[in-house]
């Protein structure tokens, strides 16, 4: 249920007070009464049955003639006007009931009739309710409607009387000649077919009926004139269009239909601020808005409110045609109901191509048309000569397959206007450049933001070869770079989901029936044809919605929409042509203040300057605004806040080591400021360290000291020149003489003692954490030292460093879920690599005997203290080695990296109190078999020969989960991960893993069922792994085939079959040892930090 709006201006539309339903109830009662009058007027039987209650009502409460079609119509119109909350209807009903009440009171006094007294009391209560409910009848009628209605009534009665007199003269019956005119006047004006004793005869019977009908028509016309709602002129003024164009320029980049708001046979209403507007047209009492509001989304609610207020003033039902999801949400918040109307077809030109099975029909059509010598020409309207544009207009009219131009929310309704120079014309030309050049098709598209177009007009010469439209659309998409277009909005498919889902096997009976109905009406309205013409291009579908006030209004809204879109054509009676090229509005809707302040133009051209309400970025906190004001002051004073480089002479660390009296120039970030009046102390930091800067008025003067204090804020980048000395307390300081701003910091720094305390903020603002947190700097320095050590150590061993592809067609080299991406140039899905292994092995086949790579890999897995979706890996391969040789090298690499970071073979680990403590990792490290480590934990014998049943029992006893489809290798490895890996502390090598779990590893040379593979684990984290690589191409093919079957079965981590790798392996690879190490985890091990702390920019959660 919709909650009432907070804005009081909308309150009356949503008010649920005790009198809010009076208009509806009174209209309902009189509507039922009018039906009864109509029925007993045409049915003598019903008139006889209801005679007693009819006469009672007629005598005391409300006129109820026995035969009066005109009265039935009048009451029906009054009922409709009351239900529409028209104030004039309230006046008529209240006065009418007041007159009857006075008559009853008089009769009560004179005749003492109790029925008159009861009726008077009842009517007084009714009148009291009507008076109390007067504010609910707020709808206006047209200005001067009462006088116009009186004129229509008198004129209509006069004409009807003259016609009736003629009929009486033709068919007089026994009526005397001198009474015939009076008879006609009586019957027309009384509007009742009853006898009158004044006359001495009667004309023919049917004459009475005709005369009564003529009177009813005159009365009906008068009442309709009185109750008719205010009419909209459905037109823009030049200033209105100018303001709309300004809004589109600044806020219309995301709305494909925004430019259609400049269509000139619409009216417009603006938000009071002028920041947003709604264009609309009124048809049969429905105020039909087209698409989303134009302008600043923050002002949309105010524009919608103004639009609803306008509609409520004149009794219009409100509806919206073709709103986007964003727009529909805004209208729904304003109280409208929302129904998905269909979908808009959007082509992303960078993704469009004619390849693939789905595009075969379009590809064939394009090829067929090209054989006829048809080419495509694209021009902006501004580049088209006037004579060519005149020919375009003629062709558009001649080739139109309907009598009138269709479209309202998604059509511009004009061609050749000088203000539409950014529109795009796409022409299919036969024999281009020759004397026989002939245009056989054309598309006209309006601008959609800076890099899109939206289809306005589509024409095809009746004799053109089939496929001309497909050629134009495909050429527009594939040659879009020539015109700077990246997105194209095609036609709108009404009820697309019905056509799509209803034609599928298994569609329900209701859906099939609904589709059949739409297909039937498609004979006239091309509903299915629009869907078929769009779906062939494989577009993205963007939903469009119909918004409306009440379900009871849906039929009228649908009919009004059909009129507006041109599907239903009403008789002209002076209606304007759909090709509106001039401004016909007489009253500007744009707020008057904007006309002068924004430089609007009466010819509809865009404003001279950007509107003053355009946004210049996010709303700034007060402290940021203060700093930005300082930035502006610096600019006014001619001081460059972001100057060109002037390198310092010393780093801060070097300056601090310089002898006292040394002249230096340092640069860094201002972290602390302490102002003691005549002297200011500041702390400045660069990457090498911190130093205190002393600014003394005795050295620089009071004025410069004041300038320094006023100019600089915490966080600013500063360059200071001076001499090394000491403060009065003997603290080493740089005695400042000169300074300049190197960069103004526009945001305040965090607390100088706590820094960034929130972990997510530290990740999101990593640059700030590094600038303020010495530990973060130390970790990055340690990481750099570790990576450099790994690279230097391998280089010293004769390894060559290479780079292999990150984008790969097949994901392999490890069991992990990959990230998927797409290359538009080849219309090909690609993976971000999960490992460089298979490419490095190709190089081993090529003869590279020692090769390594340090690079990024990507795995679509969880994020925690030891996992990040992207991380750095080291992989190294050495011919004529094995996993034991890789074990020695791995240990030596890590020990050398520890020396590079700390100068000794130590690592840092958190102690019991959370403080980091040193751990010696020199010498040999423990080596255990995987099965032996599991057996050690369980206290029972576990080996590669242990049966599947025994392993399952051990898992059940120790609450280790497993799947019934797993083999012994998978279960044994699951036990290892639960019992061993998580509880390992000191670096340990675990060897001889199950062969079934190692698809790229050589089987053990002497132990069946296991492979020559080890994992290095420390403090619950796997640091690296190494194999004796599998070089048998036949065995390797069998294993990867098995993996590909798992992948096909839905295992996201199983490797795919890489035929190129297998073909390379079939050329023979020497016996090789392979090593893989997680560089981030090695840094974690050495520094004692988490994986997030060791990365410069770890992945952060999305902003809320």
Curated annotation (Swiss-Prot):
Cofactor annotation: Mg(2+)
Pfam families membership: LPG_synthase_C, tRNA-synt_2, tRNA-synt_2_TM, tRNA_anti-codon
Subcellular location: Cell membrane
Family stated for the protein in its record: In the N-terminal section; belongs to the LPG synthetase family.
Record-linked Gene3D superfamilies: Bira Bifunctional Protein, Domain 2, Nucleic acid-binding proteins
Protein name per Swiss-Prot or TrEMBL: Lysylphosphatidylglycerol biosynthesis bifunctional protein LysX
Known catalytic reactions: tRNA(Lys) + L-lysine + ATP = L-lysyl-tRNA(Lys) + AMP + diphosphate; L-lysyl-tRNA(Lys) + a 1,2-diacyl-sn-glycero-3-phospho-(1'-sn-glycerol) = a 1,2-diacyl-sn-glycero-3-phospho-1'-(3'-O-L-lysyl)-sn-glycerol + tRNA(Lys)
Region (Phosphatidylglycerol lysyltransferase), start-end ranges: 1-608
Organism placement in taxonomy: Bacteria, Bacillati, Actinomycetota, Actinomycetes, Mycobacteriales
EC number: 6.1.1.6, 2.3.2.3
Superkingdom of the organism of origin: Bacteria
GO aspect biological process, one term: lysyl-tRNA aminoacylation
Cofactor info, note text: Binds 3 Mg(2+) ions per subunit.
InterPro entries according to UniProt: Aa-tRNA-synt_II, aa-tRNA-synth_II, aa-tRNA-synth_II/BPL/LPL, LPG_synthase_C, Lys-tRNA-ligase_II, Lys-tRNA-ligase_II_N, Lys-tRNA-synth_II_C, NA-bd_OB-fold
Region Lysine--tRNA ligase: start-end pairs: 609-1104
GO cellular component, one term: plasma membrane
Residues given in the record as Mg(2+) 1 binding sites: 1015, 1022
Entry keyword set: Aminoacyl-tRNA synthetase, Antibiotic resistance, ATP-binding, Cell membrane, DNA-binding, Ligase, Lipid metabolism, Magnesium, Membrane, Metal-binding, Multifunctional enzyme, Nucleotide-binding, Transferase, Transmembrane, Transmembrane helix
Topology of the protein relative to the lipid bilayer: Multi-pass membrane protein
Main location: membrane
DNA-binding region: 664-739
GO MF, any single term: ATP binding
Binding site for Mg(2+) 2: 1022
Coiled coil (UniProt feature): none
Protein's gene: lysX
């Amino acid at each position: 249920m919709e909650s009432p709006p907070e804005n009081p201006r909308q309150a009356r539309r949503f008010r649920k007070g005790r009198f809010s339903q009076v208009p509806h109830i009174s209209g309902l009662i009189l509507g039922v009464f009018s039906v009864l009058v109509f029925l007993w007027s045409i049915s003598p039987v019903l008139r006889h049955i209801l005679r007693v209650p009819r006469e009672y009502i007629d005598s005391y409460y409300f006129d109820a003639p026995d035969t009066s079609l005109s009265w039935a119509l009048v009451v029906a119109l009054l009922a409709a006007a009351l239900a529409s909350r028209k104030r004039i209807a309230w006046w008529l009903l209240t006065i009418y009931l007041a007159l009857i009440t006075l008559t009853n009171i008089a009769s009560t006094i004179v005749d003492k009739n109790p029925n008159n007294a009861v009726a008077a009391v009842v009517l007084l209560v009714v009148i009291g309710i009507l008076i109390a409910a007067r504010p609910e009848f707020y709808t206006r009628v047209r200005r001067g409607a009462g006088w116009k209605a009186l004129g229509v009534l008198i004129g209509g009665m006069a004409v009807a009387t003259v016609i009736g007199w003629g009929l009486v003269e033709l068919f007089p019956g026994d009526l005397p000649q001198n009474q015939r005119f009076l008879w006609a006047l009586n019957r027309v004006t009384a509007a009742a077919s009853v006898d009158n004793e004044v006359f001495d005869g009667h004309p023919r019977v049917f004459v009475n009926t005709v005369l009564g009908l003529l009177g009813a028509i005159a009365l009906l016309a008068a009442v309709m004139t009185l109750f008719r709602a205010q009419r909209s002129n459905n037109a823009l003024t030049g200033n209105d269009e100018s303001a709309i164009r300004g809004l589109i320029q600044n806020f219309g980049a995301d709305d494909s239909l925004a430019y259609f708001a400049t269509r000139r046979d619409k009216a417009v209403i603006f938000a009071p601020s002028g920041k947003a507007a709604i264009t609309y047209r009124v048809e049969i009492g429905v105020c039909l808005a087209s698409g989303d509001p134009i302008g600043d989304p923050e002002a949309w609610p105010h524009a919608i409110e103004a639009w609803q207020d306008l509609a409520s003033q004149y009794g219009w039902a409100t509806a919206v045609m073709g709103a986007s999801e964003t727009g529909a949400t805004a209208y729904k918040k304003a109280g409208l109901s929302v129904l998905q109307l269909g979908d808009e077809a959007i082509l992303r030109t960078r993704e469009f191509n004619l390849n693939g099975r789905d595009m075969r029909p379009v590809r064939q059509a394009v090829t067929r048309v090209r054989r006829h010598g048809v080419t495509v020409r694209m021009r902006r309207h501004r580049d088209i000569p006037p004579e060519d544009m005149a020919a375009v207009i003629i062709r558009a009219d001649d080739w139109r397959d309907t009598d009138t131009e269709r479209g309202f929310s998604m059509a511009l309704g004009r061609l050749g206007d000088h203000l539409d120079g950014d529109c795009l014309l796409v022409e299919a030309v036969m024999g281009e450049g020759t004397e026989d050049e002939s245009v056989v098709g054309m598309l006209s598209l309006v601008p959609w933001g800076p890099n899109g177009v939206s289809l306005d007009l589509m024409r095809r010469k009746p004799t053109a070869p089939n496929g001309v439209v497909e050629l134009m659309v495909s050429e527009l998409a594939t040659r879009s770079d020539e015109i700077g277009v990246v997105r194209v909005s095609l036609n709108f498919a009404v009820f697309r989901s019905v056509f799509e889902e209803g034609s599928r096997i298994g569609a329900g009976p209701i859906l099939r029936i609904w589709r059949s109905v739409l297909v039937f009406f498609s004979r006239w309205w091309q509903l299915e044809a629009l869907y078929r013409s769009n779906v062939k291009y494989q577009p993205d579908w963007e939903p469009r919605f119909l918004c409306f006030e009440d379900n009871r209004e849906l039929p009228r809204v649908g009919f009004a929409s059909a009129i507006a879109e041109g599907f239903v054509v009403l008789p002209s009676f002076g209606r304007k042509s759909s090709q509106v090229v001039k401004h016909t509005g007489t009253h500007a809707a744009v707020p008057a203040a904007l006309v002068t302040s924004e430089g609007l133009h009466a010819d509809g051209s865009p404003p001279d300057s950007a509107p003053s309400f355009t946004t210049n970025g996010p709303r700034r906190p007060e402290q940021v605004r203060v700093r930005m004001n300082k930035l502006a002051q610096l600019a006014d004073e001619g001081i460059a806040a972001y100057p060109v480089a002037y390198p310092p002479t010393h780093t801060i660390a070097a300056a601090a080591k310089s002898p006292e009296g040394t002249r230096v120039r340092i640069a860094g970030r201002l972290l602390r400021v302490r102002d003691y009046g005549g002297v200011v102390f500041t702390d400045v930091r660069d990457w090498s360290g911190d130093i205190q800067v002393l600014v003394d008025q005795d050295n620089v003067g009071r004025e410069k000291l004041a300038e320094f204090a006023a100019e600089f804020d915490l966080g600013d980048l500063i360059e200071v020149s001076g001499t090394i000395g000491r403060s009065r307390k003997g603290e080493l300081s740089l005695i400042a003489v000169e300074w300049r701003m190197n960069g103004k910091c526009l945001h305040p720094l965090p607390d100088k003692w706590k820094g960034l305390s929130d972990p997510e903020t530290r990740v999101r603002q990593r640059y700030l954490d590094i600038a303020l947190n010495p530990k973060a700097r130390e970790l990055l320095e340690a990481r750099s030292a570790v990576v450099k050590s790994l690279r230097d150590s391998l280089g010293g061993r004769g390894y060559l460093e290479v780079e292999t592809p990150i984008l790969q067609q097949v994901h392999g080299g490890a069991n992990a879920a990959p990230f998927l991406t797409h290359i538009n140039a080849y219309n090909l899905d690609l993976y971000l690599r999960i490992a460089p292994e298979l490419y490095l092995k190709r190089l081993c086949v090529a003869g590279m005997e020692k090769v390594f790579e340090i690079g990024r890999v990507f795995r679509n897995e969880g994020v925690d203290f030891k996992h990040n979706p992207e991380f750095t890996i080291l992989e190294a391969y050495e011919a004529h080695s094995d996993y034991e040789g890789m074990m020695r090298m791995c240990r030596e690499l890590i020990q050398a990296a520890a020396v590079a970071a700390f100068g000794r073979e130590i690592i840092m680990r958190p102690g019991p109190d959370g403080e980091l403590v040193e751990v010696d990792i020199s010498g040999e490290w423990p080596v255990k078999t995987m099965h032996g480590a599991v057996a050690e934990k369980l206290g029972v014998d576990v080996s590669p020969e242990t049966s599947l049943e025994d392993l399952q029992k051990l898992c059940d006893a120790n609450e280790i989960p497993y799947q019934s489809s797993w083999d012994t290798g998978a279960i044994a490895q699951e036990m290892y991960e639960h019992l061993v890996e998580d509880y390992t502390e000191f670096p340990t090598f675990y060897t001889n893993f199950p062969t079934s779990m190692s698809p790229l590893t050589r089987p053990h040379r002497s132990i069946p069922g296991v492979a020559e593979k080890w994992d290095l684990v420390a403090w619950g984290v796997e640091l690296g792994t190494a194999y004796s690589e599998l070089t048998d191409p036949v065995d390797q093919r069998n294993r990867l085939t098995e993996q590909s079957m798992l992948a096909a079965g839905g295992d996201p981590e199983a490797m795919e079959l890489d035929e190129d790798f297998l073909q390379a392996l079939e050329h023979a690879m020497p016996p090789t040892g392979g090593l893989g190490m997680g560089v981030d985890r090695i840094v974690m091990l050495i520094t004692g930090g988490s994986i997030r702390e060791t990365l410069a920019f770890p992945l952060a959660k999305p902003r809320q």
